[in-house]
């Protein structure tokens, strides 16, 4: 931190002559004469020696100087002049290699101010909102460096977003609240936040920040953005994260269903750390080794996850699970009125998971006999046929629908494709007559 940080702006003014570089920068600024005069007086008071010493803490000191020493009511033009001088200095430095290294936007133990970003074209996008709190990022707070890296990585991703300015501002505010929450609650890693901590964050927003549900949801989006950004930008896949993003798992196309809306695998709902760790190990094996279709793996995991959540609520380690506990769980899911086929899917999922636990040495044997609990499935036929009269009526009014809906209906009616398959068709899959 520069020497001026230890000085107080009310100290007795010393006889100090500003360097020519600083005087020229102030004189070249397009502002009122009295504004330039106040800047020179303040810089002389703090003994500014180089424009590189201009940063956000000094800007705040200048704000206090204007407010409490000069008793000015409208300080906006004066702060704008300060910012313009700093921004002009950054633009000049970015023309040289040494200057780019000096002004590079990087994570340091200091306060970062977005209008002083090394990419001044990007910084000027926030020029009209530079007075807002979400422009200031204090990385001097007592928090683990790893957490600061995650916040800084997400901050850069949000700054590069191409969305509307209002939405980007909401993301910045949400990320700032998340950073503050993590510091206050000693959270060292965004990727290990579980469901309980997520609820605590919602309560934090409810009690201190956001007054309505929609505001909470908008600010909560920052947590998902941070999780996704960090997970995708990690040099290697972080298998210890509580939320995995499918696009980072590098799965071949033949294992993915293009029509599936599944984008994440979540472990945060499993409250017991040991059970959560076993679930991650199981899914890492399924995704990385088995070669099965991802949809099959994810569906099975949903059944296993439900069981592990129930066990964790009982504060029971899955390795010490007994047959009586499994029977209690099966009785519980039967109360939901599930079909015999779905019940057998639960049995098959538990069997698959316990075989994995035995094969990897976490258990000596499977704690129940799956075949004993399986039910007889009676196939059912669902008549989904459409009468010819209805088909003719739809075809007669088809011209009233938009082109994409007409194409979808004709595919379903003529070709027999599934709805999910039709939804995956793209524009370049069609041949247009005479084109």
Regions found by a protein language model. Name each.
Residues 1-360, 397-400, 410:
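Charge-rich, intrinsically disordered N-terminal extensions
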Residues 322-326, 366-375:
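Long, charged, glycine-rich C-terminal linkers/tails
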Residues 340, 361-365, 405:
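Short, flexible/disordered secondary-structure transition segments
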Residues 364, 376-393:
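DNA breakage-rejoining catalytic core of tyrosine-based enzymes
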Residues 389-419:
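Basic, Lys/Arg- and aromatic-enriched nucleic-acid-binding interface segment
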Residues 422:
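Short, basic/aromatic-rich helical patch in the C-terminal catalytic core of site-specific tyrosine
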Residues 425-435:
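Conserved tyrosine-mediated DNA breakage-rejoining catalytic core shared by Y-recombinases
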């Amino acid at each position: 931190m520069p020497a001026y940080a230890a000085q107080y702006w009310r100290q007795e003014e010393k006889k100090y002559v500003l360097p020519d570089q600083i005087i020229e920068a102030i004189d070249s600024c397009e502002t009122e004469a009295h504004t330039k005069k106040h800047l020179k007086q303040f810089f002389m008071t703090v003994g500014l020696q180089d424009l590189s010493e201009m940063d956000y803490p000094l800007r705040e000191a200048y704000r206090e100087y204007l407010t409490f020493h000069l008793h000015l009511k409208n300080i906006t033009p004066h702060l704008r002049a300060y910012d313009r001088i700093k921004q002009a200095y950054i633009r000049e430095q970015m023309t040289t290699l040494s200057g780019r290294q000096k002004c590079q936007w990087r994570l340091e133990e200091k306060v970062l101010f977005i209008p002083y970003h090394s990419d001044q074209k990007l910084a000027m996008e926030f020029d009209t909102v530079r007075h807002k709190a979400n422009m200031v990022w204090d990385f001097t707070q007592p928090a683990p460096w790893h957490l600061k890296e995650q916040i800084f990585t997400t901050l850069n991703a949000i700054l590069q977003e191409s969305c509307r300015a209002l939405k980007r501002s909401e993301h910045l505010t949400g990320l700032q609240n998340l950073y503050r929450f993590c510091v206050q609650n000693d959270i060292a890693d965004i990727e290990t936040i579980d469901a309980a901590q997520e609820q605590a964050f919602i309560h934090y927003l409810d009690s201190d920040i956001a007054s309505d549900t929609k505001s909470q949801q908008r600010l909560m989006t920052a947590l998902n953005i941070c999780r996704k950004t960090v997970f995708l930008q990690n040099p290697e896949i972080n298998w210890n994260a509580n939320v995995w993003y499918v696009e980072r798992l590098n799965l071949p196309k033949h294992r993915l269903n293009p029509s599936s809306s599944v984008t994440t695998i979540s472990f945060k709902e499993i409250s017991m750390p040991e059970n959560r760790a076993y679930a991650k190990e199981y899914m890492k094996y399924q995704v990385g080794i088995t070669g099965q279709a991802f949809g099959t793996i994810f569906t099975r995991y949903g059944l296993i996850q439900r069981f592990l959540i129930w066990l964790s609520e009982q504060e029971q380690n899955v390795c010490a699970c007994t047959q009586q506990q499994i029977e209690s769980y099966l009785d519980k899911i039967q109360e939901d009125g599930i079909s015999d086929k779905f019940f057998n899917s639960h049995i098959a999922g538990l069997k698959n998971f316990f075989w994995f636990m035995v094969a990897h040495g976490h258990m000596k044997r499977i704690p129940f006999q799956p075949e004993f609990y399986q039910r007889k499935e009676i196939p059912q036929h669902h008549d989904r046929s459409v009468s010819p009269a209805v088909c003719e009526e739809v075809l007669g009014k088809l011209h009233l629908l938009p082109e994409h809906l007409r194409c979808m209906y004709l595919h379903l009616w003529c070709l027999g494709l599934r709805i999910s398959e039709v939804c995956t068709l793209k524009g370049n899959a069609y041949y247009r007559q005479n084109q």
